[in-house]
A protein has these predicted regions:
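Helix-start (N-cap) detector for alpha-helical repeat units in TPR-like alpha-solenoids
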Residues: 36, 70, 74, 108, ...
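N-terminal leader/linker segments that initiate helical-solenoid repeat arrays
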Residues: 22-71, 75, 309, 315-317
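Bacterial N-terminal signal peptides
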Residues: 8-20
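Structural marker of alpha-solenoid helical repeat scaffolds
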Residues: 65, 69, 103, 132, ...
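TPR/TPR-like (Sel1-like) alpha-helical repeat modules
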Residues: 115-119, 269-312
Length: 317
């Protein structure tokens, strides 16, 4: 099993908080269901003592009874998550997570527990993958992504390249390799061109990869090849009509080409999709101002000023 595979889904939180060692499971001599379901209070007490198998049915029941005090239901849900993870019953864990999310959607303690529960579930699933199919493309991909997130660029690149060597036409890997070239700080001056070649290979394999089209558009735009960039942004939008950044990129190119009226529709769409993006409002304001819509332009400049809150924004001359 690749060394970093088990860490892939647990990079931002502490893994293993609810692992099998976190709660001692009391072995039961009786068959399941041979006792009545304990009351919510009794179930909580049993779970706190580590008697998870005895308590789990009562904890589940407590979450469904509206007459049970909210604090007891919350405690039952949290203990239910911990117990079910200790028992490695992932289906029940997800049931408790759903119940907690529905009943206590903004409670910070609940959200904290859910974050760690998802981390634990992700780690266990990654371990399943490494155990069941350690040489699969999926396992190598997960390992590469984990290495990349840790800033271990060279090993990650080798993982992606090994996948491509194994199957040159696998979808998504050329895109990930291209993204890595653009992300690594030590990639050198040829990184953008290496990345561009990978994105071109990706859209040859998978023409519907909107992300690859978008990055190709951005690379062309930064090289001041706006006509080429617009074609790529249009392809990205075709395959992902909610791709706000692609609409913005198209609008920026049209403004650079002084096609101000043509720039307004994609920028309006970008504004609708990402109303909190200051760059969208400033670019739209510029297009409106230079196409003669002074009043609308000033409104957009005003929104931009409010979003940047004192950073200093000026209307173009």
């Amino acid at each position: 099993m690749p060394r970093y595979l088990a860490k892939a889904a647990a990079l931002f939180v502490l893994p293993g908080c609810f692992g099998p060692g976190s709660i001692l499971l009391t072995q039961q001599s009786h068959a399941p269901g041979s006792q009545a379901v304990p009351t919510p209070e009794k179930a909580v007490s049993l779970a706190e003592e580590g008697r998870c198998r005895e308590s789990i049915a009562g904890l589940k029941h407590a979450m469904t009874v509206t007459t049970v005090a909210a604090e007891v239901r919350k405690q039952a849900g949290v203990l239910g998550v911990r117990c079910s993870l200790a028992m490695d019953d992932r289906e029940v864990t997800n049931e408790f997570i759903r119940a907690l999310t529905k009943q206590f959607p903004k409670d910070p303690d609940v959200l904290f527990v859910i974050v760690h529960a998802y981390s634990d579930l992700s780690t266990r699933t990654a371990q399943d993958l490494g155990r069941e199919a350690p040489q699969s493309i999926a396992a190598h991909k997960l390992n590469a992504e984990a290495l990349e997130m840790q800033g271990k660029w060279e090993p990650a690149q080798h993982e992606y390249e090994a996948i491509i060597q194994k199957d040159p036409n696998v979808r998504g890997i050329h895109f990930l390799l291209g993204r890595l070239f653009l992300s690594r700080p030590d990639a050198g001056p040829e990184a953008a061109e290496h990345a561009r070649q990978e994105f071109l290979k990706e859209i040859t394999i998978d023409p519907s990869n909107a992300g690859a089209h978008y990055v190709l558009g951005e690379l062309a735009r930064r090289d001041e090849k706006c006509e080429e960039a617009i074609l790529q942004f249009s392809e990205a939008i075709k395959f992902n009509p909610s791709f706000a950044e692609a609409y913005l990129g198209e609008g920026l190119c049209l403004v650079n080409l002084k096609k101000y009226e043509e720039a307004v529709p994609p920028l309006r769409t970008a504004e609708r999709l990402t109303p909190g993006n200051p760059e969208v409002h400033h670019t739209l304001a510029t297009a409106l101002q230079r196409s003669g819509h002074k009043e609308e332009a000033e409104k957009e400049f005003s929104i931009h000023r409010s979003l940047t809150s004192g950073q200093g924004s000026e209307s173009p001359q």
